[in-house]
Amino acid sequence: MQRIGVTDYTILGTVKGAELELVRFTHPFMGFDVPAILGDHVTRMPVPVPFTPRLPRPGRLCDRSEIRPGKPLTRLARTALICRALIRRWMARTSYSDSVNCHTQPISAIFDYKDLRFEPPSNRISPAGQTSVDRLLQLSQGQAVEGQSAVARLTGEKKNHPGAQYANRLSPRIANNHPATQQTLFELGSGAKERNAINVSYLTALGTPGFTLMLPARMLCGIVSDNNFTQKQLCPSPARCTRGPAEPAKRGPWLEPGLVIRKDGLRTGKLLSSLRGLCLTVLRFQPTVPCFCRLALSSSVAISSTGLVNFSR
């Protein structure tokens, strides 16, 4: 928060026994509210001896509870198990000095300001190794509408993404909302089935001009934007997407007319710009027409009604 000059914030609640505070503040550059978790809880959270450092199944991170100002958040003892595993996972990736950046996100969940609910993200893995898209969030003026969709295969193959049939994959209630209505559609999928693919998650957005998306900077592997959403191949190794500019022939044909946002927040391309602040990369869509956008993420994601992407794995 000091990095972007935030001095005033509102405390929404505290996490029992973890020295954490859930706060909300107004971003000084973009003007929207940002939820954040403050505290060095990873190295200080007590870990019961019987617990082993292994992660639970997706959707089992924490219990469903209410967030109210001045009252602690109830949580399962399994949260300590998650934190112990995260310590080993992140030691090789980053330092503990920026704990809010990488260590709070894996135990975060969806924050819905409409009724201040606190719920864990959920997803289902089909036997074929694909992610069954069971949650679609539609954002319009900060309000989220949940819907169900059919199984979507986000492997980057052309036959799986015909532009004319994409809307037919969604539920009727969601498919009727065309991008011309100035609404934004998100979809979560996995690309681990490909032979040379790394086990990452892909976030597909149907973005409209001026839409803003926030996500933790260190979790973004790459982003590809395409007006047609066809004939594009995902990078087989997301790590290659973060090494800076390179020849399109070495990176794949999907770079044209797409673009890639690197981990350091620098941008290449002309459709999208990024802003670094409070450990978040703020992506603002600036196309002239609604376009599809796919993000390669290094963890599973859950999207809130404010556009903040929390990671859980």
From Swiss-Prot:
The keyword Kinase does not apply. InterPro entries: Beta-lactam_class-C_AS. The active site is at S190 (acyl-ester intermediate). PROSITE patterns: BETA_LACTAMASE_C (PS00336). It catalyses: a beta-lactam + H2O = a substituted beta-amino acid. It is an enzyme of class 3 (hydrolase). Induction: By penicillin G, impenem and AmpR. Its EC number is 3.5.2.6. Belongs to the class-C beta-lactamase family. Upon expression in E.coli enables the latter to utilize penicillin as a carbon source. This is Beta-lactamase. The lineage of its organism: Bacteria, Pseudomonadati, Pseudomonadota, Betaproteobacteria, Burkholderiales.
